[in-house]
Amino acid sequence: MAKTYIFGHQNPDTDAIASAIIMADFEQLTGNSEATPYRLGDINPETKFALDHFEVKAPELLSDNLDGREVILVDHNEFQQSAETISDAEIKHVVDHHRIANFETASPLWYRAEPVGCTATILYKMYKERGFEIKPHIAGLMISAIISDSLLFKSPTCTDEDVNAAKDLKDLANVDLDEYGLEMLKAGASTTDKSAEELLDMDAKSFNMGDYVTRIAQVNTVDIDEVLNRKEDLEKAMLETSANEKYDLFVLVVTDIINSDSKILVVGAEKDKVGEAFKVQLDDGMAFLSGVVSRKKQVVPQITDALIK
């Protein structure tokens, strides 16, 4: 049996890493003994906390050419967010909770996308539907992914299904959701030991928005000013990256995980459109966005609409 490569998006967050591991376990339970999780970037501190807590080994960094290889995508579908050779791969299955864009295949496939807050929530449902046993460490990874994507159930992307899945799994994983969740989020919120380039690359995705290519990075923190005090270095790095990668717009979203607000820093010729998107006036390229925490639901659609109208 040929190997099946399973991976989430570039600059992986906790859901991307956890869902790759979970999906590989699910596939193995179906009889696919060669299902193997991979990652498309470094493990961030939040994810490392979760992996260490549940004693799970991090997936190997993907380096293989995927030409003709069988792959399963989790937590993404857009090719610009995926592996470099994804267009040459044989995509067999996708499990995701994002918009569908810049995605096509030569052959039919299994595609499961649901409007929930986390890919791991969909995977939880898949285990239940098949009557598969959920191992304690798999339960822990599911919980970690849900807490990460929902910011401990505060994000507007969070649904009752996400909350109920986490509650159903907590005893199996042997964790208190609030206590463990806050510890995990704080583990990923330290920014003082990272360069501007590292901050911008921690959780960043590229999006095709009409005729524009937009890069949106998000940094979770307990102190927004701690991040934006480095505005000059961040802007310089954003401009350099935009020039090298030909981004029309680069938006940094700095999110306060305690108070559930964000500030944005924007560079690019179309940056005034970002102000229009949120009905705010950018001040030196920055603006405060009250109650905004979700890139998927509160940032991407708004900027897309502003750019294409």
Swiss-Prot record:
The keyword Cytoplasm appears for this protein: yes
Descriptive protein name: Probable manganese-dependent inorganic pyrophosphatase
Residue numbers binding Mn(2+) 2: D15, D75, H97, D149
Protein EC: 3.6.1.1
Protein keywords: Cytoplasm, Hydrolase, Manganese, Metal-binding
Catalyzed reactions: diphosphate + H2O = 2 phosphate + H(+)
Gene for this chain: ppaC
Necessary cofactors: Mn(2+)
Organism per entry: Staphylococcus haemolyticus (strain JCSC1435)
